[in-house]
């Protein structure tokens, strides 16, 4: 295989648009800061093109070995493509063990095939931030916050359950004292003032509105008969056995002779059918009378 790097064809359409947006996020000032930091740690010159100088992975492997000795056991000086890709892969594994988060690390092709230089720069900035937390004097990136663990006794934790934290807001010394359930009566009197006791529960207070003397006396359940006479006037009671015209008329019909739903219905009239005769005990069993048939549906 030749020593030339892999070359991709030009990007078109959406791929070109995405590549241009990523390129616009690249910070050249940060690049200069990273160049000075890496060259100062390794003692090697990167070259005029920053990304091309890091593409073989040699400087990157030496750089992580300076920050964390023994991170990369073998650095390939060969110009073959697979050796250079191996160097980049070893660098990625080393910074992962160093503490850089996986979502901050670039892929090998982002650098080797020039697909995403912005992500490569972000990885180096994340490495600088991690180096600061380990005591290295770096002027690039921001220092990660150190973990501050606190241990509390179980008694102290139980006491905290009785306190409303300011995170939840403050009740301003308000309480639910004197509050009643939703929908119940509210009495507008103060027992300390010696005022009269509230009305009995059978009276509707004016706070709830007024019924204007109306009551539910004489009201019946929905669907039942409504008597249209007044007993106080001496009127006669309505006959409850008859269907009043207020409910409509049955035109003299009744349920007499009706059977339960599903039973057989007799379709003969006894006036036109002979009564069956049965032989007496002393008579012969044969009867010459015509048979009577009972037809049923």
Swiss-Prot record:
Domain Calponin-homology (CH): residue ranges: 28-131
Tissue-level expression: Smooth muscle, and tissues containing significant amounts of smooth muscle.
GO MF, one annotated term: actin filament binding
PROSITE patterns assigned: CALPONIN_1 (PS01052), CALPONIN_2 (PS51122), CH (PS50021)
Residues in Calponin-like repeats: 164-189, 204-229, 243-268
UniProt cross-references to PANTHER family, sorted A to Z: CALPONIN, TRANSGELIN-3
Family of the protein in this entry: Belongs to the calponin family.
UniProt protein name: Calponin-1
Naturally occurring in which organism (per UniProt): Rattus norvegicus (Rat)
Classification of source organism: Eukaryota, Metazoa, Chordata, Craniata, Vertebrata
């Amino acid at each position: 295989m030749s020593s030339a790097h892999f070359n991709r064809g030009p990007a078109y359409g959406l791929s070109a648009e995405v590549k241009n947006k990523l390129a616009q996020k690249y910070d050249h000032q940060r690049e200069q800061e990273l160049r000075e930091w890496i060259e100062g740690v390794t003692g090697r010159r990167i070259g005029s093109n920053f990304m091309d100088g890091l593409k073989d992975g040699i400087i990157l492997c030496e750089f992580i070995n300076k920050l964390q000795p023994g991170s990369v056991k073998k650095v390939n000086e060969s110009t073959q493509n697979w050796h250079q890709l191996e160097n980049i892969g070893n660098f990625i594994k080393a910074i992962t063990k160093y503490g850089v988060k996986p979502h901050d690390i670039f892929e090998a092709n982002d650098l080797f095939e020039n697909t995403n230089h912005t992500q490569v720069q972000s990885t180096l900035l994340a490495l600088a931030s991690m180096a600061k937390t380990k005591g290295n004097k770096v002027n690039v990136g921001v220092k990660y916050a150190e973990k501050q663990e606190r241990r509390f006794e179980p008694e102290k934790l139980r006491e905290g359950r009785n306190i409303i934290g300011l995170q939840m807001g403050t009740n301003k010394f308000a309480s639910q004292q004197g509050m009643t359930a939703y929908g119940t009566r509210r009495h507008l009197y103060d027992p300390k003032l010696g005022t009269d006791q509230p009305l009995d529960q059978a009276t509707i207070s004016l706070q709830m509105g007024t019924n204007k003397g109306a009551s539910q006396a004489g009201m019946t359940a929905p669907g039942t008969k409504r008597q249209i006479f007044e007993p106080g006037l001496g009127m006669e009671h309505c006959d409850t056995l008859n269907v009043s015209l207020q409910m409509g008329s049955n035109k003299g019909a009744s349920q007499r002779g009706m059977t339960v739903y599903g039973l057989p219905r007799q379709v003969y009239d006894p006036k036109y059918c002979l009564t069956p005769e049965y032989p007496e005990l002393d008579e012969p069993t044969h009867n010459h009378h015509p048979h009577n048939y009972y037809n049923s549906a």
